[in-house]
């Protein structure tokens, strides 16, 4: 039988601005969300979709973007983002986060004027850089273990199944179109002359959740008023059936319907990754693995000479490098150049438990390139490492507010992880450092840093510059994955580029005293993320692989049934790691005390 899978999406054009609210603890001025959106065309193909992604990157993501820079300067949001909304018919969503709704008209004007200017002649260097990001991504896709799933997810419903396998051909075609008017015409047809449009803003409301609860209570009260004895009896019977179902053990017949792997189908040997340690000017760890011509470079600098407060500021410096002016290039030009020579540039911290006593503290500098562009890519990364300028207060505040916005946007999706790390930070030194530099502790520090950069910029910059000069020393190890020929060349590039690094200063001990601690952190969410943790070493126990099996069983079915099936949380479980930390968690949980009782029942 033929089935009709066609799903129609109405092409609405909203002439009036749509106003809404969002939950907030405090109703502050300048914390509104501004949105400009429109739908893409119907029945789009892969070429159309790839063009959208390239243009989104070139027009809105690059630091050279005129639209982005004007919005940051005039609208002054905490963050400005552009994304494709997925569905049967995609949407382009442009959002200014934590801005003033009084500037909404100007926000719309900047976007629409930017479209008109771009369709007259888009910045070709931004276009080349955006395109280069996709080319690197496709090379990585060729060697990814997830490539099958990725190709499947790229398939658009009701389109040819093998359409996504033609992506390289489409990219070749789109590259050749950069120096034509294809992209300008695309902007005019799909952005400017688009028959759909939505302009929206949301203001903070401290009564949002209370009002929603009141609406729900009124709805339930109305249901109860109209409830018949017969309907009430049916509901009670269904609840009883649900309780019986939840508490009933599965029969052997029911268990047999669950797909399982036979134990003999599970490999018992771990595939060995090729690894060679080479002592040269620096220590190199080399992996001879097929990379489809890509070169993966990670430099690890020992930063054991930095204290905890300096490490906190280092997390800010990591966001500044590559996003502020250097001695040779303004930040508004960096992206246009950078992504033509490399992809995935990253400055970050890494902390490794060497043993129970020692934690290696490392600064990681990494990027991906090819042999044709690796030397230029290394030059650019070194420029960020040694020649960055931190004297632009407005730009520094933009980056700090963006960092805060990113954390706030993602905190509810990873609330259970933040809760576990925060709980463990009171009993484990490594997790304490992790929390202070990437968890709740880092968020609290970030808010203080924004105030410091705003009220006493000279003092703030003084700290940043002093720490910046101490980061990169000759205590360096390099991890490279590439072909043997490419590795040999890149090793020479690195030896030459980092020939004059300073010697590392003495090691600084970071103090820590474990303590039992109960803590509650208030958020705008109307659900909870709960964690209770312990270190098994305090009970004279050591980590054992059997503990992983035990936590798996305790997570599902035990905690799953108590906290999710019966308690209404989105998720719950317990984890264990090699440091001996046992961590329970619940995710988007409507309860608190009931969940803690469930943890205690273990």
Could you say what each language-model-derived stretch is?
Residues 26, 84-86, 192, 287-289, ...:
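Generic marker of residues within folded, mature protein domains
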Residues 130-288, 417-511, 518-520:
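C-terminal regions of mature proteins
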């Amino acid at each position: 039988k033929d089935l009709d899978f066609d799903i129609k999406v109405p092409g609405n054009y909203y002439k009036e601005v749509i106003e809404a609210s969002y939950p907030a603890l405090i109703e502050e001025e300048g914390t509104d969300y501004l949105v400009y959106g429109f739908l893409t065309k119907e029945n789009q193909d892969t070429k159309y979709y790839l063009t959208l992604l390239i243009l989104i990157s070139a027009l809105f993501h690059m630091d050279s973007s005129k639209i982005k820079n004007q919005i940051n300067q005039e609208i002054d949001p905490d963050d400005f983002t552009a994304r494709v909304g997925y569905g049967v018919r995609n949407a382009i969503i442009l959002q200014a986060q934590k801005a003033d709704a009084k500037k909404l008209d100007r926000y719309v004007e900047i976007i629409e004027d930017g479209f008109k200017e771009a369709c007259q002649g888009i910045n070709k260097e931004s276009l080349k850089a955006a395109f280069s990001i996709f080319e690197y991504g496709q090379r990585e896709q060729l060697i990814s273990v997830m490539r099958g799933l990725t190709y499947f997810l790229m398939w658009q419903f009701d389109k040819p199944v093998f359409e996504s396998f033609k992506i390289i051909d489409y990219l070749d075609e789109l590259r050749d179109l950069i120096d034509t008017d294809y992209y300008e015409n695309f902007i005019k047809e799909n952005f400017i002359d688009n028959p759909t449009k939505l302009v929206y803003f949301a203001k903070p409301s401290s009564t949002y959740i209370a009002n929603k609860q009141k609406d729900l209570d009124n709805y339930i009260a109305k249901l109860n008023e109209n409830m018949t004895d017969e309907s009430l009896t049916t509901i009670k019977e269904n609840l009883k059936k649900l309780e019986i179902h939840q508490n009933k053990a599965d029969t052997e017949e029911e268990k047999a319907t669950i797909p399982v792997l036979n134990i003999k189908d599970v490999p018992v040997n771990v595939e060995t990754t090729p690894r060679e340690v080479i002592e040269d000017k620096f220590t190199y760890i080399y992996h001879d693995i097929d990379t489809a011509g890509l070169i993966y470079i990670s430099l690890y600098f020992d930063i054991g000479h930095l204290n905890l407060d300096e490490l906190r500021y280092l997390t800010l410096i990591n966001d500044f490098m590559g996003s502020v002016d250097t001695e040779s290039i303004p930040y508004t030009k960096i992206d246009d150049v950078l992504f033509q020579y490399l992809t995935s540039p990253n400055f970050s911290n890494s902390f490794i438990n060497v043993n129970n006593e020692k934690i290696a503290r490392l600064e990681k500098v990494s990027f991906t390139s090819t042999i044709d562009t690796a030397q230029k890519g290394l030059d650019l990364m070194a420029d960020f490492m040694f020649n960055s300028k931190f004297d632009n207060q407005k730009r520094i505040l933009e980056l700090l507010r963006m960092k805060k916005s990113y954390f706030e946007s993602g905190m509810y999706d990873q609330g259970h992880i933040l809760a576990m790390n925060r709980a463990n930070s009171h009993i484990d030194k490594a997790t304490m450092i992790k929390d202070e530099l990437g968890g709740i502790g880092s968020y609290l520090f970030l808010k203080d840093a924004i105030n410091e950069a705003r009220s006493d910029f000279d003092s703030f910059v003084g700290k940043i510059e002093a720490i910046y000069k101490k980061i990169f020393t000759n205590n360096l190890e390099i991890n490279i994955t590439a072909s043997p020929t490419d590795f040999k060349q890149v090793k020479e590039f690195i030896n030459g580029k980092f020939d004059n690094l300073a010697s590392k200063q003495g090691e600084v001990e970071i103090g820590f005293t474990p303590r039992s601690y109960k803590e509650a952190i208030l958020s705008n969410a109307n659900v909870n993320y709960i964690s209770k943790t312990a270190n098994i070493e305090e009970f004279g126990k050591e980590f054992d692989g059997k503990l992983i099996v035990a936590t798996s069983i305790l997570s599902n079915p035990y905690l799953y049934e108590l906290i999710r099936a019966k308690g209404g949380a989105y998720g719950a479980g317990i984890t264990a790691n090699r440091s001996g930390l046992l961590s329970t968690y619940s995710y988007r949980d409507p309860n608190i005390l009931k969940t803690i009782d469930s943890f205690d029942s273990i």
